[in-house]
């Protein structure tokens, strides 16, 4: 039993496209006070049969939905190649590689993402490895479902560590080509 409001946001699908459901692994990376969470996912709740209370059912990814007109969904969303947040995080990555402080770029992203809760999420420079980890996570949160994650994992040499299904390949980097 899903509300009409949610049903109207999800359907119609149209033009041969389906719905993308975000994995729990990715959804768990977002904190509830990060505005990117609600811009990335629509959580779907149904009523619990026994209690009548809302119960989490699933989610859909909101990015690239296009628009709905006259009962049809038109997938007309532009594919984003680069945006300002990408430039900031690439700058942070380059600064960190040069042993410079990437805090200002990361914090500029976080100010927008956390708004009035920003003070609880201020980034301060750590070791080069800690900074890399923070930049990689920030890129996940900022660019989820925009086609950048795989290349970030390759560039940071983190694919085997962060993609559980790659454990089958025992670190064989030749398997990372595609």
PLM regions and their residue ranges:
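Polar, glycine-rich mid-to-C-terminal structural blocks
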Residues: 1-26
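Acidic/polar-rich alpha-helix caps and helix-coil junctions
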Residues: 31-178
